[in-house]
């Protein structure tokens, strides 16, 4: 096995782990929705879409064979994480300033018309308000945890990729 093959295998494992973590986060959100009765707002649903896209691109990237194709999907993962961080950041802002509505009247029909809301309404249909406070987990709200997760993806994916490929140059 060549050095490049070993390093690309490591990147593939990172991507598979990232995809599994994103699916676990969506599973946790569904658990909180179904079992704990915490209704998802439009911004929550958009964050779920971002996590799902990150997982999808991570799994596809892990299936790629060339460095260039893996890089393309790593870039897509980072773009989705940046979008997710933007949504989560706005959600955190909305929770700190409840007078600022997330626009449930505007966003709800748009989010509810997305394809997954029709296929899997339990997981991707809006049912709550963005300013509704839920009990924090380890001192942070769900929106804050989502922001942390997205920022970690934005930082760690390029960092791990560049460190992994540094010796190949």
Swiss-Prot record:
Protein name: Disulfide bond formation protein B 1
Keyword Lipid metabolism: no
A Gene Ontology molecular function term of the record: protein-disulfide reductase activity
SUPFAM superfamilies assigned to the protein according to its UniProt record, in alphabetical order: DsbB-like
Membrane side Periplasmic: residue ranges: 32-49, 90-144
Disulfide topology: 41-44, 102-130
Gene Ontology terms: cellular component: plasma membrane
Gene it is expressed from: dsbB1
Subcellular location: Cell inner membrane
Membrane-related topology note: Multi-pass membrane protein
Domain of life: Bacteria
Job description of the protein: Required for disulfide bond formation in some periplasmic proteins. Acts by oxidizing the DsbA protein.
GO BP term (any one): protein folding
């Amino acid at each position: 096995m060549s050095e490049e093959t070993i390093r690309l295998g490591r990147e593939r494992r990172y991507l598979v782990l990232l995809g599994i973590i994103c699916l676990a986060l969506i599973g946790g959100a569904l658990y909180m929705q179904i079992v704990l009765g915490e209704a998802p707002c439009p911004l929550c649903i958009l964050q779920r879409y971002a996590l799902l896209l990150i997982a999808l691109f991570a799994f596809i990237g892990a299936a790629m064979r060339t460095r260039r194709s893996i890089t393309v999907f790593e870039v897509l993962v980072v773009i989705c994480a940046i979008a997710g961080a933007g949504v989560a950041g706005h959600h955190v802002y909305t929770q700190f300033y409840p007078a600022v509505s997330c626009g449930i009247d505007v966003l709800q029909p748009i989010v509810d018309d997305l394809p997954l809301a029709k296929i899997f309404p339990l997981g991707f249909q809006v049912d709550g308000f963005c300013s509704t406070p839920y009990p924090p987990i380890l001192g942070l709200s769900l929106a804050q945890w989502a922001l942390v997760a997205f920022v970690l993806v934005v930082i760690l994916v390029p960092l791990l990729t560049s460190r992994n490929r540094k010796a190949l140059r």
